[in-house]
Curated annotation (Swiss-Prot):
Cellular compartment(s): Cytoplasm
Subunit structure: Monomer.
Protein name, per record: Phosphoribosylformylglycinamidine synthase
Boundaries of every Glutamine amidotransferase type-1 domain copy: 1045-1298
SMART domains: GATase_5
Catalysed reactions listed for this entry: N(2)-formyl-N(1)-(5-phospho-beta-D-ribosyl)glycinamide + L-glutamine + ATP + H2O = 2-formamido-N(1)-(5-O-phospho-beta-D-ribosyl)acetamidine + L-glutamate + ADP + phosphate + H(+)
């Protein structure tokens, strides 16, 4: 084994943070230094050249001075017997660089901790430095040699039920954490008695997973008695009622990994499977929809819990039908009180938590990063979500209880697209090859399905921790590329049947695959790809290693499938074959036995149906009188409540422009304020139709009136989706995610009544269908605190997500108030008809109360009429701004509109209140409704339309937006409240700032927070030196010649499709080229005029951003020669964007005239930054930017490592003086800046784009390919038509070629 020292592992900021954490828990720690340590398992001595290549490979990341370490060594390495994702990718790169003697590379972090540490101190330090699920701590570097030793496989064990009977099974139930119910134990005893043999541990674990509440939804399929009355429908039956009442527009419901609804016809853009040239295929583009929860893992380990939650939901979408494509995501969190140190709020009363779970604050610091990181690396924009905190001590008939979310809700969902012919699964033929696609088996996530079905606290802490999975999004991206190549073959798609691997691992996925396909299966355990050879059969078969799919491919199609996998470098293995007989057999060639051999009927058949006998309990609540509250204090408290406050910290970490199909994200207007009501995507690049999604949830109401909370969740989803041009209300389809603490007094009945209110009453009345959903029935946390029993129980929680096809994405309404449209009015539409009920409101919560009467959907006809009128007014162009009323009430809706419009507001409340005592209820009640801005001249017509729809009593003109900074509320001729907008916006933003300060570079967080004080900030703006509508490439396109441009990608790249679309629009033939094509000699760059390296996460960025990709070119003779020859040609051009920019900056030795180019390293904020930033085009040599110099315009930014690090001050000066700096960040005032967030990565002198001296090669961190259409821009001027400002760049390249 070779040991190679690496660069320092922590930036100054991260170092300071970790040292602070360590000293807080172990005061004896006085200092810390950390560096990477690399270990190479070699088959022979390396030559001097090979040593040099290896040394260069392992030199990556920012240039930080290396120290001579001192202190006690804590070497954190992957667990022995495992292969980390870093190792597999780095080893791939080494092989591609010709280092054949390197069997494997692995990496650890060597922490040198200074201080007089006792053994107990050392144990505490070690615990805080590693993830015990995937890592261990050594005290010497040489100990890492054990990383490369291979453990012997552990054997199978049997449970002696024939001899030991029920007691043996009960013992196994506890030891293995199976969570089997009494009747399931009876069932297993009977089944194995009939088989005449003892069950193996693997069979019991498999049964427990497949039949867990998590997988089987026993409560939703149960029979019910409530108060002694038999109920005639199951919960699931009542949900299905919505489909039975209205099937229109639903293509697949309740039977696949996601539901499918009807979309629009468009030109679906992808490469031709034969020629590899991108083109549009005109066809129906159907919409798939799915929302999952990952609550249990997120409570234990928030980053991997939320990350794998998003990853699992993405796999659900990809594994729908015969293969589909995920498109846009959403994330939601509900947690208990945050209690941010130094920022504790008056309503937050500390209650404690069990050791096994993390705090609500930890969840909100780490969890969103996990969800965002997976979406970012996979390449899916995260476009909407929600965040709520709730934790309150309340009086009940059984005494005081704490209700809240110590077991959090972590929601991951999204939508995608699927071809019409692939909506339904195909047939599994006898003899079909059964395949595992994706990553290897690892000993992680064991028993996750069963664990998430228990109340937190009912299992041991070790089992809890073992049930959390770990993530590798780059692997999932490779799998998706394989699935994409398959569905793009149309009728020749080799996939006949596909499922994702989730809860229960292969033990759930493979039986489900063959069972759903009407077959049995014969499997070989040792064929399963396995990175931990020491695992037992149970561990191989049941672990929940992520990024895997199971599928069936007919023998005749196997070579096609194999070739696709090899080109995409995606691991796969044939693990079995389909058989006629409905038997499940798993053979183990190592031990020459059969760990599993049972009829599918025993595993998935007639397990006993659950019966619930429950009673209703009195509704809860307390008296809450808002009349006497001080208005200013109430406004400030409400604005600081996380459900109301800015969600910016959740949003800027997630890429919102990837795909180039995003028409409406969370950030609104020139000031990019996070207040959008819904997310909207375009169907494709050639149409204005699209898809919308939005969420609704009002969970605290369930403590007072559970059915009302369900109705309000649906109502809020409708009022949010009303902002999109949907058409008719019945076009909306819902996903319903149900959470409850089953078994807690009164909760089962509340759940039943809520499902009934939604499924049997409101949805049928609205004509809305719920074709998909999920349930989590163990929302309770129990623990002991110094001998005292404690528990936190969540309310019945329905989270609703609505999806709908959109007629015109350009007509998506936003809350941004407009001052450039003449005199205007604000109109309130109050669907509560003046009731202004405050029960369960944020106002009540911030004063430590619940209240009693809650908002409700009193009349479905009102909601239907509201939706129809808003859609009509939008179609007619009457609505300038729209915002629904929700958490925080009317005052919050109006303030958020003012924040987005950067203006003041004059409100007149005379029409809304009969007395001053009623003002608090008017301002803070959360009844359904909306505020719209219309031109003053259109107000009579708008009011008349509402009146004609029967909503006369619901509408009132309540004020006007005004120039300036003042928010004034007037009643009976006097001003009852006045405040400056910027002060209120800072209060609204402070919760987000406080979390950002803890999580990211605190200096950057402070700069962004202070930027809100700039009243004169003009926002985003456009100043062009060219005509955006002038198609300078048109004369060349008319010649019919389409020069070829290689759209180059490496494994992990995810931005190729929109890049191809931009070049295609400019008149190029865009060709899909994978690095594997070049390394194998299938493609020669001589055939191309242009080469574009696209954005993404090549090799998961394991050897530095873009560096592994670059080095696989530099140190591979064939690739190096090909690229060097291409760059030397005077008729060639190249572009590198984001990851492609990072990669090309490392190829400067091959690209003439680029010796001064920088290296791109971690952003100064230490965070992935996804923003719309202003850039100025410089006078430069770049062929792409000719005629654009002096232009200032917004552009999409999405990167974690975009800081330009020059080799020296001289190199920076050389770049500046050479005329090769092509783009710089500027602030909204137009000045070049290094200040955050206008310069999101902190690059010196705002530099974010450069070119070679002759201008043929340009690199840039921003993404022009995502905003070449006007409609792709988060904000755009009203006079832009089809073309966006950045299309000129691609047209310039087309002109240059001729």
């Amino acid at each position: 084994m070779l040991i190679l020292r690496g660069a320092p592992a922590l930036s100054a900021f991260r170092h300071g943070k970790l040292l602070e954490q360590l000293t807080q828990h172990v005061p004896a720690v006085t200092g810390l230094y950390a560096e990477f340590a690399h270990f190479a398992d070699v088959t022979g001595a390396l030559t001097a050249d090979e040593e040099q290549v290896l040394a260069r490979l392992l030199k990556y990341g920012p240039s930080v001075p290396v120290q001579e370490p001192s202190g006690r060594l804590f070497l954190v390495v992957p667990r022995f017997g495992t292969i980390s994702p870093w190792s597999s990718k780095a080893s791939d790169i080494a092989r591609n660089c010709g280092l054949a003697k390197i069997d494997r590379l692995e990496r650890g972090i060597a922490y040198y901790v200074q201080g007089e540490l006792s053994e107990s101190d050392a144990q505490q330090v070690a615990a805080r430095l590693h993830d015990r699920m995937t890592q261990l701590v050594l005290d010497r570097l040489e100990g890492a040699a054990e990383l490369f030793s291979h453990a012997q496989p552990r054997p199978l064990t049997a449970v002696d039920v024939l001899g030991g009977g029920r007691a043996a099974l009960e013992k196994a139930n506890v030891e293995l954490g199976l969570a089997l119910a009494e009747d399931e134990i009876d069932y297993l005893l009977k089944s194995f008695g009939e088989l005449g043999r003892n069950p193996h541990d693997v069979e019991l674990m498999m049964f427990a997973q497949a039949n867990s509440e998590h997988c089987r939804h026993k409560i939703f399929n149960a029979s019910w008695d409530i108060d002694g009355q038999a109920q005639d429908k199951s919960l699931f039956g009542m949900i299905k009622n919505t489909y039975e009442m209205n099937r229109e527009g639903v293509l697949s419901a309740y039977k696949d990994n996601a539901a499918v609804i009807v979309g629009h016809v468009a030109g679906r853009f992808f490469p031709d499977p034969q020629t590899r040239e991108y083109a549009a295929s005109r066809e129906p583009v159907q919409i798939l929809m799915k929302v999952e929860t990952h609550n249990h893992p997120t409570a234990i380990a928030p980053f991997p819990g939320a990350s794998t939650g998003s990853g699992g939901e993405i796999r659900d979408e990809g594994a729908t039908g015969r293969g589909a494509k995920p498109k846009a995501g959403l994330t939601g969190f509900t947690v208990s009180n945050l209690q941010i140190p130094g920022f504790e709020q008056p309503w937050e009363v500390p209650y404690g938590k069990p050791e096994r779970i993390v705090t609500a604050l930890d969840i909100m610091v780490e969890g969103p990063l996990g969800g965002a990181a997976f979406n970012n690396e996979f390449g899916r924009p995260a476009l909407t979500g929600y965040f709520r905190t709730f934790e309150q001590k309340i009086a009940t008939p059984h005494g005081e209880e704490v209700r809240g979310y110590h077991k959090p809700i972590m929601l991951a969902g999204g939508m995608g697209n699927i071809r019409d012919e692939h909506v339904q699964k195909g047939e599994i033929s006898v003899g079909a090859k059964l395949i595992v696609l994706g990553g290897p088996a690892m000993l992680i996530g064991l028993g996750g399905g069963a664990a998430s079905s228990m109340a937190t606290g009912a299992s041991s802490a070790d089992l809890d921790f073992a049930s959390v999975q770990r993530d590798n999004p780059e692997m999932e991206r490779r799998c998706q590329e394989v699935i994409d190549r398959c569905w793009q073959l149309g009728e020749r798609n080799p996939i006949s049947f596909i499922h994702d691997v989730g809860a229960g691992g292969l033990s759930n996925a493979l039986p489900e695959l063959i069972n759903d396909g009407g077959r049995g299966g014969r499997f070989e355990l040792r064929a399963v790809p396995n990175d931990e050879p020491g695992m037992s059969p149970l561990e191989i078969w049941c672990n929940e290693s992520q990024e895997r799919y199971v599928l069936s491919v007919d023998a005749a199609d196997f070579e096609t499938f194999k070739a696709i996998c090899e080109r995409e470098r995606c691991p796969f293995a044939v693990v079995g074959e389909a058989i006629e007989q409905r038997q499940l057999t798993v053979a183990d060639s190592h031990f020459d036995n059969k760990p599993v051999d049972m009829p599918l009927e025993v595993l998935l058949g007639k397990a006993p149906r659950m019966h619930r006998a429950v009673t209703r309990e009195a509704e809860l609540g307390d008296d809450f009188d808002a009349a006497g509250l001080e208005l200013q204090e109430s406004v400030e408290r409400v604005l600081r409540h996380p459900a109301v406050a800015s969600k910016s910290f959740l949003i800027t970490i997630g890429d919102r422009t990837i795909t180039g199909l995003v028409a409406r994200d969370q950030m609104v207007g020139p000031w990019q304020v996070p207040v959008a009501d819904c997310a909207v995507t375009a169907t494709s690049f050639d149409v204005y139709t699209g898809e919308a999604m939005a969420m609704g949830e009002r969970t605290p109401l369930a403590l007072l009136d559970a059915p009302a909370s369900g109705r309000m969740a649906i109502g809020e989803t409708v009022t949010n989706l009303a902002a999109a041009r949907v058409g008719k209300l019945s076009d909306i389809k819902l996903s319903a995610n149900w959470m409850a603490a089953a078994g807690h007094p009164g909760e089962d009945a509340r759940l039943y009544d809520t499902v009934k209110a939604v499924g049997m009453e409101l949805c049928p009345e609205l004509g809305i269908t719920i074709p998909v959903g999920k349930d989590s029935m163990s929302m309770k946390t129990r623990w002991q605190d110094n001998g005292e029993d404690k528990s936190v129980t969540s309310p019945v929680s329905l989270i609703v997500t609505g999806f709908a096809p959109v007629a015109d994405v350009r007509q998506s309404l936003t809350p941004q108030l407009r001052l450039d449209k003449g005199e205007t009015d604000l109109i309130l539409i109050d669907l509560g008809r003046g009731k202004n009920r405050l029960g369960g409101s944020i106002l009540a919560q911030v004063h430590g109360k619940l209240g009693r009467a809650v908002p409700d959907v009193d009349d479905a006809e009102d909601l239907k009429a509201f939706f129809a009128v808003i859609q009509g007014l939008n179609a007619d162009g009457h609505i300038l701004a729209y915002h629904d009323r929700s958490d925080g009430g009317l005052i919050t809706s109006v303030l958020e509109m003012a924040f987005a419009g950067h203006c003041g507001v004059e409100l007149n409340l005379d029409a809304l209140a009969d007395s001053r005592e009623e003002l608090a209820a008017v301002l803070f009640s959360e009844e359904l409704g909306a505020v719209i801005q219309v031109r003053e001249g259109a107000t009579p017509e708008v009011l008349a339309q509402f009146s004609a729809a029967g909503l006369d009593d619901c509408v009132a003109v309540i004020g006007q937006p005004v120039n300036g900074y003042e928010i004034n509320l007037n009643y009976n001729g006097e001003t009852v409240y006045s405040a400056q907008r910027r002060i209120l916006q800072r209060i609204w933003s402070e919760t987000s700032y406080q979390i950002q300060r803890l999580r990211d570079n605190a200096d950057c967080a402070e700069q962004e927070f202070d930027a809100l004080l700039d009243e004169d900030n003009p926002g985003l703006s456009i100043k062009l030196s060219y005509d955006v509508n002038d198609d300078i490439a048109a004369p060349y396109i008319k010649k019919g010649v389409r020069p070829k441009v290689a759209i180059l990608r490496e494994q992990g790249v995810n931005g190729q499709v929109e890049m191809a679309a931009a070049f295609d629009r400019a008149g190029f033939a865009a060709i899909d080229v994978h690095m594997s094509d070049i390394l194998a000699g299938r493609v020669d760059l001589d055939a191309f005029k242009g080469l574009v390296a696209c954005g993404g996460f090549s090799y998961g960025d394991v050897l530095g951003a873009g560096e592994g990709w670059a080095k696989s070119i530099l140190f591979n003779a064939r690739a190096r020669d090909g690229f060097q020859a291409f760059f030397a040609r005077k008729d060639s051009f190249a572009l590198g964007v984001c990851n492609g920019c990072q990669m090309m900056s490392n190829l400067h030795e091959l690209i003439p005239g680029t010796e001064f180019w920088p290296h791109f390293v971690r952003n100064r904020s230490e965070q992935f930054e996804a923003r719309v930033a202003m850039v100025q085009v410089q006078e430069s040599s770049s062929i792409f930017l000719q005629g654009m110099a002096g232009s200032r315009l917004p552009i999409a930014i999405a990167h974690g490592e975009g800081h330009a690090e020059f080799e020296s001050e001289e190199a920076l000066l050389e770049a500046d003086l050479s005329g090769c700096v092509s783009l710089r960040f500027v602030d909204n005032h137009g000045k070049v800046t290094e200040a955050y967030p206008a310069n999101p990565n902190g690059s010196p002198r705002g530099i974010t784009g450069l070119s070679s001296r002759d201008g043929r090669v340009t690199i840039m961190m921003p993404h022009p390919e995502r905003v070449f259409r006007a409609v792709q821009n988060s904000w755009r001027p009203d006079d832009w038509q089809e073309d966006g400002g950045w299309l000129r760049m691609f047209r310039n390249a087309r002109v240059w070629v001729d």
